[in-house]
Swiss-Prot record:
PANTHER family with a match to the protein in the record: 30S RIBOSOMAL PROTEIN S16 (PTHR12919), SMALL RIBOSOMAL SUBUNIT PROTEIN BS16M (PTHR12919:SF20)
InterPro entries: Ribosomal_bS16 (IPR000307), Ribosomal_bS16_dom_sf (IPR023803)
Key words of the record: Ribonucleoprotein, Ribosomal protein
Record's protein name: Small ribosomal subunit protein bS16
Pfam families, A to Z: Ribosomal_S16 (PF00886)
Gene: rpsP
Amino acid sequence: MLTIRLALGGSKKRPFYHLTVTDSRNPRDGSHKEQVGFFNPVARGQEVRLSVNQERVAYWLSVGAQPSERVAKLLKDSAKAAA
């Protein structure tokens, strides 16, 4: 099953996550089909906290990909901010 989830990046004490579409059996930071955005939980000042390619997310959801709980919340926040 395809899932949209967060893949950890960044450095020590500075987490950074990529929103990726991957098979649910792959490891968290393993191979993925496509990167559809990023999430920076420690963004400061003018740094962008969340960026999502809404068109690609809509495509993957229409094909049957399931978002993780955290990604579903981030997508909801992103849609609210865009409106």
